[in-house]
Amino acid sequence: MSEHTIAHSITLPPGYTLALIPPEPEAGWEMLEWRHSDLTTVAEPVTFGSAPTPSPSMVEETNGVGPEGKFLPLTISPLLHKTSRKALTPTPSLSPLTSLACPNSGIGPRERSTSTPIPSAGTSSTLTQRVLQSLRAPSASTRRSLTASSSSPSTQR
């Protein structure tokens, strides 16, 4: 059997999926696999890595998110077909020119651009200033929506 069995699959934003994969039938839940596919250019999903997960009950409680609501840090690796300790070693699967970057990693394919340079440190755009102001002083409607959507007061600022 070269294909792994996905016992539970959770749908995330377009192009992202999350799957819990049992490495051995008797071993229980051990792996959390993130996959991302660029729907416009890549036919096969690109795996961003696998990492040990907490117990299944903890994963269910956090809806697929790591402890304390944080996503697990993962590295780029090929799609894992047979889960073993050796399979956790990341190896590049795409050429540098066609590789995709992990979300929020800051690393990815470089493209030549004719756009204007980024302003030097110490200057900021009006848009950035407006965003910062809106984050500092949320409106009454924002506070209401935070209160309505949050069950713990620690998420309100």
UniProtKB/Swiss-Prot annotation:
Residues 46-70, 83-157 are annotated as: Disordered. Coiled coil: none annotated. Residues 88-100, 134-157 have a biased composition (Low complexity). It comes from the Viruses. Residues 114-132 have a biased composition (Polar residues). This is Protein p17.
